[in-house]
Amino acid sequence: FMSVKAPENDAFKKTWAAYVKKHNLSGGTDRVTNDPMEATYVGMHMWAQAVTKAGTTNVDAVRKAMAGQTFKAPSGFALKMDETNHHLWKPVMIGEIQADGQFDIVWKTDKTIRAQPWSPFIPGNEKKSKM
């Protein structure tokens, strides 16, 4: 959410606004950030951290280096790459949409939550590894 109050989010929004202006993107200052943008931003930074740690772009070495690493996301939380399944530990936020299209965050977790890789609500998943 653009409305998340965190220094990391302020920096993320400022960088995005500068990019929009520099490239004269349609919509100008009305353009907003969104979850796919943040996910890409986090993913690329975590990949770069893993490449640096591995000292190579070799896929197996980078995958191994990603396990357990953290990155401070625009949400202000330090997200973690799970060591066993590479799912991302993230916070949960519930927001109420406002007239301006932004969200008022009405509830959020105090910490990141480990992802559940196999939903118990999808038939057949009970046979998959719990990792």
Model-derived features with residue positions:
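Extracytosolic ligand-binding ectodomains
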Residues: 1-131
